[in-house]
Every structure is written in structure tokens, then in C-alpha cells.
Curated annotation (Swiss-Prot):
InterPro entries: Glyco_trans_2-like, Nucleotide-diphossugar_trans. One of its GO terms (molecular function) is glycosyltransferase activity. Residues 322-346 are annotated as: Disordered. Gene3D superfamilies: Spore Coat Polysaccharide Biosynthesis Protein SpsA, Chain A. Pfam families: Glycos_transf_2. GO terms for cellular component: peptidoglycan-based cell wall; plasma membrane. This is Uncharacterized protein Rv1520. One of its GO terms (biological process) is biosynthetic process. PANTHER family: GLYCOSYLTRANSFERASE, UDP-GLCNAC:BETAGAL BETA-1,3-N-ACETYLGLUCOSAMINYLTRANSFERASE-LIKE PROTEIN 1.
């Protein structure tokens, strides 16, 4: 088993992550490969302490130059040697010392399963009430199709069957974990264990913090990476028309969100996303074209049904009023009784 982790300026959180790794009780060998991306705080020193304390467990990679999240993650994946891969970033942590044992036991018993995950507790540093992810409504469908539509697997909950190489992960893919989930899932099945065995933090220094606090900033900084992720996913589902259509639908949404960025910066970002990711853009357009006739039909149908309903209502009202001696289609004004009847059915 290879535990792969990345860190950058996480001195406040890294000990809990490392303690969670060291606490795992297993009957199989485990290695922890943690790559620090040239942190400027005490994170490298703390990692070094754990490597000295558990020399048979930790394989630290302490960079002197920052290479970025994508390159750091890709490199640590390539360094793994285990049959299985478990992911956990330096600001999250595990709470169950049997987490890995439970997941490996399941995978060993179900060779058709390539992705095994579990719910996580989400804690908020702004004081908001804790929650669980994925929400209950998302747990009903654990198919690859559902995973393409929305990422329901939290990074620090997942264990994969390791693939021979990760050198071909496309550049700029972000979120890389969503891409990895799909990459492993298309070769088998997805399973979720019921226990909540990890904690995911939402804090101001997190990579995805702006996704929840500042949507404009999120799409300005992460929109191109989202587009790159969807473009890369097309290689994973190539030839599967239904799944390509799902990617097209998500792509249409991503381009709409990028397009909402105001000013020249927004236009430039949208044009760059379109130019750099033509297949994703084409599928997005195909999705919109496919939706347009249906939307027209629905609008027309809605109008016609409304007209029929209005006609039926008017006919019924006239029949009732005629039966009660009320208003009839004449040039005479309605009587008092007619007004009462009309009022009671309006």
C-alpha cells in the first residue's frame, strides 16, 4: 500500500495528517510518500521529524523549488510502489486506524472494484456546522456516469488499484483528483464503505476555498483547469457516446460559468479555454444544440397546454354560470347573482 500526499505551507495541519498515517494498523506493508512543494513555513521540518521517527514508513520528498500542485501530485503518484494507492493531502486527516485495512480487505474480496471510498466529515474553520460528504442524496448512484456529472468522492477517502504509470496525465488538469477518480473507475466498479473515517477541512488557505466563498475568483483562477480536466476525461470515455454526452453537459456549464467573468479578463479566459480545449468545446456546443429543439418544443407545448387549460376553464365557467342563471355571453351586464357565481370560481 502506498499512501501519497502533498503539502505546501501547512504547518498548522500537517501533524494530524502524519499521525493518521502512522496510526494505521495493517497486515500488509505500507509506505508514505509525502512531497512538500518548497514550503516557506515549518512544514518540511515537521515532515522530517516523522521521517526520522518512522524511517521504515515515510519516504519524504522535500523540494527546494516550487513546481505547483499538478506537477507535485503527478510526481508523487509516479514514485508509488504499492499495489494500492491511498490519497490524503497535508491539511486533511484520517480518524480510523483500520481505514486502510477495511478498504484493502474489500478490494481483495471484490477484484472487479477499482475504486473504494467512504464518507468524510467536513469541518469549517469559519465556525459553520460540520457536515458529511457526499450528501445522502448523492450516494444513491455510484456509477461512472454519476461521477462524470459530479465529483462525489473526497480525495482523502479513496483507495485505488495502482496503475502501471501516471506519466501520461495531461498538463493543467485541476482538479486532478476528480480526473484520477474517473481514470480508475472506468476500468471497473466503484464501491463506498459506510463508515466515516476521515476529516476534510475547509479553510481560508485551501486550494478550493474560493469555490465556496468567491465564485468569481474561483472561475478566474480555476476555470481553465476545470476545462482541461473535462478535455482529459474525453480520452477516458472515448467512444462511449452516453458518457461523452455527460462530459458535454458539464462542459457547457463550465464554459457558461467562465463566460460570466466580467470584462476583458473574462473574455480572454473564455477564448483561451475554447482554443486550448476544442473537443470539450465542441461537445458543449453539441449539448446545447441538442437541447435547443427540445426547449423550443417544451415552450410551445407549455403555451398550448396553457391555452387549452384557459379554454377549458372558460367553457366550464360559462356552463356553470349558464346553469345557475348567471352571466351569459350577451351585451347585457351580468346580474348580481352572476357576479357572485363568477367570483366563487375565479
Amino acid at each position: 500500500m502506498s499512501i501519497v500526499s502533498i503539502s505546501y505551507n501547512q504547518e498548522e495541519y500537517i501533524r494530524e495528517a502524519l499521525d493518521g498515517f502512522a496510526a494505521q494498523r495493517t497486515e500488509f506493508p505500507v509506505e508514505v510518500i509525502i512531497a512538500d512543494d518548497a514550503s516557506t513555513d515549518a512544514t518540511p521540518r515537521i515532515i522530517g521529524e516523522y521521517a526520522a521517527r518512522y524511517p521504515q514508513l515515510f519516504r519524504p520528498i522535500l523540494r527546494q523549488t516550487n513546481i505547483g500542485v499538478h506537477a507535485n501530485f503527478k510526481d508523487v503518484l509516479s514514485a508509488a510502489r504499492g499495489e494500492y494507492l491511498a490519497l490524503c493531502e497535508g491539511d486533511d486527516y484520517w480518524t480510523d486506524p483500520l481505514k486502510l485495512s477495511k478498504q484493502v480487505k474489500y478490494l481483495d474480496r471484490h477484484p472487479e472494484t477499482t475504486v473504494c471510498f467512504h464518507p468524510v466529515r467536513v469541518i469549517y474553520e469559519d465556525g459553520a456546522k460540520d457536515s458529511e460528504f457526499p450528501p445522502l442524496s448523492w450516494r444513491r448512484d455510484l456509477s461512472v456516469d454519476a461521477l462524470l456529472a459530479r465529483n462525489f468522492i473526497q480525495t482523502n477517502s479513496v483507495v485505488y488499484r495502482r496503475q502501471p504509470s501516471y506519466d501520461d496525465i495531461p498538463a493543467n488538469v485541476m482538479p486532478i483528483d476528480w480526473y484520477l477518480h474517473v481514470r480508475h473507475a472506468v476500468g471497473g466498479e466503484i464501491a463506498m464503505l459506510p463508515e466515516t473515517m476521515a476529516v476534510y477541512r475547509r479553510h481560508a488557505h485551501g486550494i478550493w476555498h474560493s469555490a465556496y466563498t468567491d465564485r468569481r475568483k474561483f472561475w478566474e483562477t480555476r476555470g481553465h483547469g476545470m476545462a482541461a480536466t473535462l478535455e482529459a476525461m474525453l480520452d477516458l470515455v472515448h467512444g462511449h457516446r452516453e458518457r461523452e454526452a455527460i462530459v458535454g453537459e458539464v462542459s457547457a456549464w463550465v464554459l457558461r460559468e467562465i463566460g460570466k467573468t466580467p470584462g476583458r479578463q473574462g473574455r480572454a479566459l473564455l477564448l483561451k479555454s475554447i482554443a486550448d480545449h476544442p473537443r470539450m468545446t465542441m461537445l458543449s456546443l453539441q449539448h446545447r444544440w441538442a437541447q435547443t429543439p427540445w426547449r423550443r418544443f417544451k415552450r410551445r407545448l407549455s403555451t398550448e397546454l396553457s391555452s387549452l387549460a384557459a379554454l377549458a376553464y372558460a367553457t366550464r365557467r360559462r356552463a356553470l354560470e349558464g346553469r345557475d342563471g348567471g352571466y351569459r355571453e350577451t351585451t347585457s351586464p351580468p346580474t348580481g347573482r352572476g357576479r357572485n357565481v363568477r367570483g366563487s370560481h375565479a
